[in-house]
């Protein structure tokens, strides 16, 4: 068993060896290294063919037409292109956008930028289980609303939104619906023929593909128009200029094909390991799961251990590669804004750990994790005066702390 045990699959996944092997064939002189836009020789034609195959593989993952797939550098770029692209193209129609407080920073900061440009953004509060109620979304809609951007699966707590219902509501009101599927593509079935979603952001490195590659699904019927954010040679039907990175695109395509073929078996195995982990630690006193337990992606478990400081817990769990929130904001010592939006107080938000399990996690690793967590919590609480006060029956919310 390799230490530390990797339990941070929501931050990134290792590239599947089958994907890596395929990618190597598209880099060197011995392989297919040409520019897919070179139309005058075989090197270019072969590269273009490889890109076409990968485009089809990504399209098949979500049951789309291959012409609806635009390759980007990742979900952050896809989110920027979708949100800014719609806002700038449709701004004559309206300048109001709806999103939620628990979105990824790539959506929230893009919306903040649009606010600086004169757009108005409504940030919806989720329920305590992390889910946005439909009536709250509907109540926020206005005549000048042009876009709703709600993630499919939350990156910190793993809850799944009812994107079918959101899509129906948006379509009935003539509002464009963008869905950030970085955490769900390749893990949950997505079918654009049945779900009325107009734009979908996809990330390669969240589904055992390489980093630095992603895609944006852009619906053709009814047709969604975007204003390009990256200008140049007019690649990707003018929506995203820049030489296509054949080896990374091939990697994304292969990862999508594997995910589609193995999704059901992967999910069943991962859910079993996730349940084993939760059943192994839920007996620890004052331990709570964050987010809805039924509407949840199989590999995710966000747990708060009351009266334990999150950072000290992370240090105590040095054999486990876990995080206390999203990797993109884990460098800051602020409590997770996602957990705060769920109504957790700072202490509970600070004492939370995100465990995310994936394709290469083993049962032996979960056993070791349970043992490590149990021992670490016991040790840290032994040293905690707050735990002692709690055990003595003192209500810590009523304590008047002296400020020096």
Swiss-Prot record:
Gene: iscS
Name of this chain's protein: Cysteine desulfurase IscS
One MF term in the entry's GO annotations: pyridoxal phosphate binding
UniProt binding sites for pyridoxal 5'-phosphate: 75-76, 155, 183, 203-205, 243
Subunit structure: Homodimer. Forms a heterotetramer with IscU, interacts with other sulfur acceptors.
Modified-residue entries (N6-(pyridoxal phosphate)lysine), positions: 206
Domain of life of the source: Bacteria
Record localization: Cytoplasm
Record-linked PROSITE patterns: AA_TRANSFER_CLASS_5 (PS00595)
Family stated for the protein in its record: Belongs to the class-V pyridoxal-phosphate-dependent aminotransferase family. NifS/IscS subfamily.
Keyword Metal-binding: yes
Substrates-to-products reaction catalysed: (sulfur carrier)-H + L-cysteine = (sulfur carrier)-SH + L-alanine
Required cofactor(s): pyridoxal 5'-phosphate
Keywords: 2Fe-2S, Cytoplasm, Iron, Iron-sulfur, Metal-binding, Pyridoxal phosphate, Transferase
GO cellular component: L-cysteine desulfurase complex
Listed InterPro entries: Aminotrans_V_dom, Aminotrans_V_PyrdxlP_BS, Cys_deSase_IscS, Cysteine_dSase, PyrdxlP-dep_Trfase, PyrdxlP-dep_Trfase_major, PyrdxlP-dep_Trfase_small
UniProt pathway annotation: Cofactor biosynthesis; iron-sulfur cluster biosynthesis
Role according to the record: Master enzyme that delivers sulfur to a number of partners involved in Fe-S cluster assembly, tRNA modification or cofactor biosynthesis. Catalyzes the removal of elemental sulfur atoms from cysteine to produce alanine. Functions as a sulfur delivery protein for Fe-S cluster synthesis onto IscU, an Fe-S scaffold assembly protein, as well as other S acceptor proteins.
HAMAP family xrefs: Cys_desulf_IscS (MF_00331)
EC numbers on record: 2.8.1.7
Enzyme class: transferase
BP-aspect Gene Ontology terms: [2Fe-2S] cluster assembly
